[in-house]
Amino acid sequence: MKKKLLCLFLSVVFALFLGCGRGDDCGNDDETKDEKPVIYLYPETATQVNVKLDYAGKLTCTYPKYENGWSVVAEPDGTLKDVKTGKEYSYLFWEGKAKTKYDFSKGYVVKGKDTADFLQEKLAEIGLLPKEYNEFIVYWLPEMEDNPYNLITFQNEVYTNSAVLTVNPKPDSVLRVFMAYKELERPIKIESPKITPFERKGFTVVEWGGTEID
């Protein structure tokens, strides 16, 4: 009897081993979590705006609920009102998991204790308003400030190609800020990217979000 049970156990283990031979079928260790991308809409006058997200991954949370898109009336100060429910929001929120390979060829090495000052300065340089970069910092700072160092990057096409936004009516200016970072035990040498300041004009859409890469 014991011999039969042992054989059965070994058979199960062997089957599991074979089944996990294909990375796509077992586990999601290579997935990254795109955290708290929030979308601000700033039209010149009160405007009904439809927003769709074509995401190369799985949405795990949205607010308000994403139902084949968002449809809101946006005010010049960024206040949003859901067309269907009439409820008011400050921005559109989503999170998801994908297998995006983020680019760490250029970035910044920052001591954990200096993270708040760095983010405030750099996000303002990129083009976020104080309200926007304050919300960014209070979300990410608790995850970053106790690390010895952080390797911080701001992604461009790698991110925007994996999370394509379609906004109707078409905005006049769009800023999408997505930070990917890694914790470091010690500093490394890396080239800093060139920052092109963002110019807000007409109907403006702003998004920020981020992810930690192990």
PLM feature spans:
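Positively charged n-region of N-terminal signal peptides that target proteins for export
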Residues: 1-4
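Sec-dependent N-terminal signal peptides
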Residues: 6-12
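C-terminal motif of bacterial Sec signal peptides marking the signal peptidase cleavage site
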Residues: 16-19
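Protease-labile, long low-complexity intrinsically disordered regions enriched in Pro/Ser/Thr
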Residues: 23-214
